[in-house]
């Protein structure tokens, strides 16, 4: 079966062609499974994908590299400990928190640990994200404690203000009373 037949090139309908105008919306209410290609003048009935394309896995991503499949190695606890020590060193070396993994260092770690450089880079990226989240949690906690202290101080000052205002009112009412008594006598 020839997929790119001359009838397709001439614009005629081909049962093995997936039109870019096909309506993939199954909830559109259009139950006749026709192509939206009517705008272009060509109308196709039910879409058929050739069995050969489905069986060969056409369009699926392949995990093969030069014909060989490479499986992602799971890191051992020793490798993880080594990476963690390396990450802690990186934190100490970069106090400004710009912990971008140097490509030379990445390759060195890759060779030492027997892992793919991409695995090293992803591990560092994930660890950096976790570290940043932890730093934000600590910062939030310290800010929350400071806020609680300031909030409590504000409440104490407001209570003191209320007491002082009441003392002023009492004092002024006493003075008015004394003035009234002096005026009456």
Curated annotation (Swiss-Prot):
Probable transcription factor. This is Homeobox-leucine zipper protein ATHB-22. Transmembrane segments: none annotated. SMART domains: HOX. Belongs to the HD-ZIP homeobox family. Class I subfamily. InterPro entries: HD, HDZip_class_I_plant, Homeobox_CS, Homeodomain-like_sf, HTH_motif. It is found in: Nucleus. Keywords: DNA-binding, Homeobox, Nucleus, Transcription, Transcription regulation. The gene is ATHB-22. The lineage of its organism: Eukaryota, Viridiplantae, Streptophyta, Embryophyta, Tracheophyta. SUPFAM superfamilies: Homeodomain-like. Residues 76-135 bind DNA.
